[in-house]
Amino acid sequence: MKRSLHEWLAWQETAHDKAWDLGLHRIGAVWQAMGAPRLARHIITVAGTNGKGSCVCWTEGLCQAHGASVASFSSPHLSDYRERIRFDGAWVDEAELVAAFEAVDAARGDISLSYFEWSALAAFHLIARRQPQVAVLEVGLGGRLDATNLIDAEAA
């Protein structure tokens, strides 16, 4: 049993045997098992080659400046894994993140997930629980088959 964020992340780095395994079938099945709740009233997906992280931060700040509660998911992290998931600019709490990984693990059965898919599902779970007015999701490396495309966005 994994008890700390460090233990979860170390395990996730070795749990999926394929470096590149694009597609939405695995993450989609797990998200459905988790109930597939709506994340937020408004969902914005940020994609592209360069500047995605900056665009996420800018969009997050703009929404907050207009009084909206905002959740954001981006990757990779620069210094701490928790910075990938923010609520109104604040990093997610480590205990909340561990609980989210436990929820993903309970729903996945024998489905193998990539490191990014674990991150995305944990973020989706936490965002759906808090129900912010706006969720800003940064696409990873997968383009149209990226885990974030599991969530229907109103704007991209």
Please identify what each model-predicted range represents:
Residues 1-19:
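Charged, amphipathic alpha-helical linker segments immediately N-terminal to NTP-binding catalytic cores
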Residues 7, 18-20, 24, 28-39, ...:
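ATP-dependent carboxylate-amine ligase catalytic core
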Residues 12-15, 44, 86-89:
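Residue-level detector of alpha-helix boundaries and kinks
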Residues 12-14, 32-42, 59:
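Non-catalytic interaction surface on structured domains
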Residues 42-46, 54-71:
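A conserved segment at the C-terminal end of the G1
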